Regions:
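N-terminal small/polar loop signature for handling phosphorylated ligands or for N-terminal nucleophile
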Residues: 50-97, 209-252
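N-terminal glycine-rich anion-binding loop in soluble enzyme alpha/beta folds
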Residues: 1-54, 176-226
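A charged, amphipathic alpha-helical module
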Residues: 154-270
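Peripheral docking tails and interdomain loops at the edges
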Residues: 2, 107-149, 153, 280, ...
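Short Gly/Thr/Asp-enriched flexible loops that form oxyanion-binding sites at enzyme active sites
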Residues: 82-99, 266-277, 411-419
Length: 460
């Protein structure tokens, strides 16, 4: 699902209302304003325009208060029209920004109109009071994209605010790097963590009807898989588990969830691979092993791509070829498979769930991807961010690559990554790589999100 930001658009400048310079040219160039609005709207940003050019305190107060109290507005683009007395605007912008909405100043080049001078005076005033803002200069596509990325990041931060992570179980498989401080999640992101006992899921699983199971087979399995799964108890329990988790998170109104899976349900009922695969397929952010850092990463990526998100073990590196192998623990949104459709397998590891369960066998389709991971270093949030290219090895090599891990029946992604792998191994924040299909728009938006939320950014 691609998030669509909504930004206020306010032109500022004191030399307004048709005032002309000594050459008889209006200080404020309406053509530049119109072209800039059209350019940013073409990037998918919805604008809420102000009717007048803002120059004075009462105008700024009225314009920004209206945007502040509109919950659908994510931030404001302050478009430089000409020189401005910064003191007339600063207080109203400060009040707006403290409501959790982003502020960016956009200046189009040109000597006529004295636009840059107004921008620098205003931006320096924001610095004086310690206010977070962005300022960009240009009218080219790269600059417009910077404005769009910042706008999307504002929308992403606002969408994350006041969400709830549902938790089923506790730390899975000793994954210390996935644990969370609930107070920190609330303080930094406005996210609540609310736990439920896994018995709620088991009870819901028992109540699933045969009609519901058949509906899943017809509408979720048939369209995405080469063949139907075996008609056995393992398949039935896997489908029941998926439906049960879906019902519980809908009942509790969880925006995303984490599940322990093992030890726990994977020993007593079924592994959660099929459940996780179908949730990711439907764009519901989730993470196994109660990995809170991963579910936060999945949430961010899910809102920036039309495709499902994938995560798996950072399983092997070939430093010479600069490629990596990422193997999911049986879970993968089936629509990511390509060119061949996904298949079914059994989970296959009794030491990670003796009850068994359906897993997804797939090789990920080729394409550009952005990979990220939110984690913590000494309690402080950071995000590792890099780009890659998923590719499909030649048939013989593909068979060997899948076989050598011993888990050929689990999802595989083969990714070209031109990075410093020694540095990566040192700083990586988990066993997982989490990725989404996308390019510069996604990458730039995640960078701006880190800026807005004071997350340390590590680019590889």
């Amino acid at each position: 699902m691609m998030i669509r930001p909504k930004m206020g658009f306010i032109v500022f400048g004191v030399h307004k209302d048709g005032l002309k310079d000594p050459l008889g040219v209006p200080f404020i160039n309406q053509k530049i304003i119109d072209e800039s609005k059209a350019a940013i709207e073409a990037k998918g940003v919805e604008l809420v325009e102000n009717e007048i050019v803002v120059a004075y305190k009462h105008e700024a107060r009225e314009a920004l208060a209206r945007l502040k109290h509109d919950d659908s507005v994510d931030g404001v683009i302050l478009f430089s029209g000409t020189w401005v007395w910064a003191s007339e605007i600063v207080a109203a912008v400060r009040d707006f920004e403290r409501a959790g909405k982003g502020v960016i100043i956009w200046t189009v080049p040109g000597s006529q109109g004295w636009r840059l001078v107004g921008t620098l005076a205003l931006g320096a005033s924001f610095k004086e009071i310690g206010m977070k803002y962005r300022s960009v200069y240009g009218s080219d596509n790269d600059t417009v994209e910077k404005v769009a990325c910042f706008s999307r990041a504002c929308a992403l931060r606002n969408k994350l605010n006041m969400t709830t992570i549902g938790a089923f179980g506790g730390r899975g498989m000793g994954l210390t790097c996935g644990c969370a401080d609930p107070s920190q999640f609330m303080r930094e992101f406005g996210v609540d963590i609310d736990s439920r006992d896994s018995m709620d899921i088991l009870k819901a699983a028992e109540e699933v009807t045969e009609e519901e199971i058949q509906d899943v087979k017809e509408n979720l399995i048939k369209p995405y898989f080469q063949e139907m799964p075996p008609d056995d108890g393992c398949t039935e329990r896997s489908i029941r588990l998926y439906l049960a988790v879906k019902k519980v998170i809908e009942k509790e109104k969880f925006d995303m969830y984490v599940i322990q899976s093992f030890p726990g349900l994977a020993e007593e009922y079924a592994a959660s691979c099929f459940t996780q695969s179908m949730m990711l397929q439907q764009g519901i952010p989730t993470a196994t092993l109660c990995d809170y850092n991963n579910v936060l990463t999945v949430f961010l990526l899910s809102n920036l791509t039309p495709d499902p998100v994938y995560y798996g073990d950072f399983q092997c590196i070939d430093k010479e070829k600069k490629v990596v192998k990422v193997i999911g623990d049986g879970a993968c949104a089936p629509s990511l498979a390509g060119p061949d459709k996904a298949r079914f397998a059994h989970h296959g590891l009794p030491t990670e769930g003796s009850a068994g369960g359906l897993s997804v066998e797939a090789v990920l389709k080729p394409g550009k991807v952005v990979m990220g991971r939110i984690g913590r270093d000494n309690g402080m949030f950071e995000m590792i961010l890099h780009r890659g290219q998923v590719y499909t090895p030649d048939p013989d090599d593909l068979k060997d690559q899948r076989t050598e891990s011993g888990m050929w029946f689990w999802p595989h992604a083969f990714i070209k990554m031109d990075v410093d792998y020694d540095y990566g191994v040192q700083v990586w924040d988990s066993e997982y790589i989490t990725l989404a299909y996308g390019d510069e728009e996604m990458y730039g938006t995640l960078k701006e999100f880190c800026y807005l939320t004071d997350i340390k950014l590590i680019e590889m």
